[in-house]
Regions:
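Non-catalytic accessory regions flanking glycosidase/transglycosidase catalytic cores in CAZymes
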Residues: 1-183, 187-253, 260-262, 270-275, ...
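Histidine-centered active-site/metal-ligand motif
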Residues: 186, 282-284
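Glycine-rich S-adenosyl-L-methionine
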Residues: 265
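Glycoside hydrolase catalytic-domain groove-lining segments
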Residues: 120-123, 284-344
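Aromatic-lined glycan-binding groove of carbohydrate-active enzymes
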Residues: 275-282, 290
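Ligand-binding pocket segment of bilobal, Venus flytrap-like solute-binding proteins
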Residues: 352
């Protein structure tokens, strides 16, 4: 017997949320060209072939064994720009671990494939101009992080703005200013994020204060965001060091940070004199198959992709980190500046319909906890990208978030339904501004339909897999969602229904009352 959900047209308001709640990342390594996560094979995506464990026999950086080379993304591509613009105004974050070691070669000093000593990648002026044009074309707002590596300074020397000034000034002069900035990406992983040799948490606090003061003095319109970390300890203890419970699981969303040396949020922020405008953290549902052999406790197999434990991680993280936000940035928004189904490039099913319930549940759950922005990692790179790398063909998760942005307004409402197996229910105002409610009902059961009782006629938008949960395309009310002949977006139209409606096993259905 499946769950029964009763919808209502009279719900209590929880809060208003940032209109750019749904935003995304463009990795700096995409812009410059460089290494990123190795692509899965078709058989691995289908779940018929296992992902081999990484080969560490060559030594060096343990993560490098899981990477491959990718040429720079073409941010001038008409399809890419069209699909990004369809999402409406979003924050566009250009960052990632690679950004910490990227040299801004705006004077064209270095030939392709080379970088100054102490840096890994080189960003050319033309590449950055193309990125700025992209942000402008899609009505985006630009957020970045900056370089902080051996090429810029040693650990016992303070950070200096010689590189950061180049990218801030060029962006502002071009008419696409940096409107928000994090100092660096994931500073909690001190030894594996590109920092100067022997860099410590104390060095970071010193440099972050220097950077934040420099930004405020020279670019006062730019919001200061941080610390942009992935802190497993935050899942165990509150900011005062008190355990949440005896069985708290540090690996619940720690991702890669759990396997590498790291410091805590408190290590990064205690004693800092420059305050944050926005508190940020990173969240993944553990790690993908690429790192499952190294971190089995942080890996969830496909059969657990709709479990309460797996889907509950986003809200759990938000509730835990909101306590740190309240301590270090009281009254500020909370931004998840990197988010996805799994660290290390996404699960094998990230590009299929099976990722859609998690994607939509994350947005809905987060908005019930706090106000802020979720930056999906990524727009168009690796298996967790909303668009397929290179071709920019939209994946099921792209159309899912497009529907969210089309239907769900910025006022969060109390759904009146407890989150439970088979029924994850979220409610917002209508995006069109009309009186009424927009609901999302996610059926997390693999076998039972969920029955929804409507108080009146509603427009129904039912999302399902195309014949299977790991399908490459998705159906809306039984019609396949694919681009038209000239990249036209398919009609995202609802069906008027009344009485009772069934949400199929694994289905995600929007109801607009």
């Amino acid at each position: 017997m499946g769950e029964v959900v009763k919808l209502s047209n009279n719900l209590e308001k929880i809060r208003d949320v940032n209109p750019r709640l749904v935003s995304y990342n463009v990795e700096m390594t995409e812009v410059t060209g460089g290494t990123f996560w190795k692509a899965y094979t078709d058989a691995q995506i289908d779940g018929t072939e296992q992902v081999p464990p990484p080969d560490f026999s060559k030594g060096g950086n343990p993560l490098a064994a899981m990477h491959q080379w990718y040429d720079p993304i073409d941010t001038t591509n008409p399809r890419l720009r069209k699909l990004a613009k369809e999402l409406g105004s979003c924050w566009v974050r250009v960052s990632g671990t690679w950004a910490t070691r990227t040299y801004y070669d705006f004077a064209d000093e270095y030939p392709a494939g080379s970088a100054p000593e102490g840096y890994q990648n080189v960003l050319k002026k033309e590449q950055w101009i193309n990125l700025l044009d992209f942000v402008k074309a899609v009505d985006g707002k630009l957020k970045i992080s900056v370089a902080n590596c051996d090429g810029l300074h040693t650990h016992d020397e303070p950070w200096n703005p010689s590189q950061a000034k180049l990218i801030f000034d060029l962006s502002r002069e071009y008419g696409v200013p940096v409107e928000a900035v994090e100092f660096v990406n994931e500073p909690n992983m001190l030894a594996n994020t590109g920092f100067p040799k022997d860099y410590t948490a104390a060095d970071f606090r010193r440099d972050q204060d220097i950077f934040h003061k420099w930004v405020r003095d020279n670019y006062p319109e730019c919001a200061i965001v941080g610390p942009s970390d992935t802190d497993p300890m935050a899942m165990q203890v509150d900011p005062d060091g008190k355990p949440y419970n005896e069985n708290a699981d540090a690996g619940a969303s720690a991702g890669i940070a759990e396997a590498l040396p790291y410091c805590t949020t408190a290590d990064l922020l205690d004693g800092c004199t420059e305050k944050l405008d926005v508190f940020s953290y990173h969240y993944y549902n553990g790690v993908s198959e690429r790192m499952a052999a190294m971190m089995p406790s942080a890996f969830t197999p496909a059969e657990g992709a709709m479990s309460e434990e797996y889907l509950g991680m986003a809200g759990h993280c938000a509730r835990c980190f909101s306590l740190y936000r309240d301590k270090y940035c009281p009254g500020g928004e909370m931004w998840v500046t990197e988010s996805g189904d799994a660290g290390a490039g996404g699960h094998t099913w990230a590009s299929t319909y099976l990722e859609v319930p998690r994607t939509l549940n994350e947005i809905g759950d987060f908005a019930t906890v706090t106000n802020g922005v979720i930056f999906h990692n990524t727009l168009a790179s690796s298996d967790y990208g909303w668009l397929k790398h290179g071709t920019f063909v939209p994946r099921p998760s792209y159309f899912a978030v497009l529907l969210w942005k089309k239907l769900m307004g910025d006022t969060v409402l109390a759904s009146g339904e407890a989150i439970r197996p088979g029924a994850h229910v979220y409610a917002h105002s209508r995006k069109d501004g009309k009186e009424g409610v927009a609901y999302l009902v996610i059926n997390t059961s693999w076998t039972e339909a969920t029955t929804v009782e409507l108080p009146k006629a509603a427009e129904v938008y039912a999302l399902t897999g195309n014949g299977k949960m790991r399908s490459r395309t998705m159906l809306l009310n039984g019609k396949e969602l694919v681009l038209g002949e000239n990249d036209e977006i398919p009609a995202l139209e609802g069906v008027t229904m009344e009485g009772t409606v069934e949400v199929a096993p694994g289905g995600c259905t929007f109801f607009v009352l």
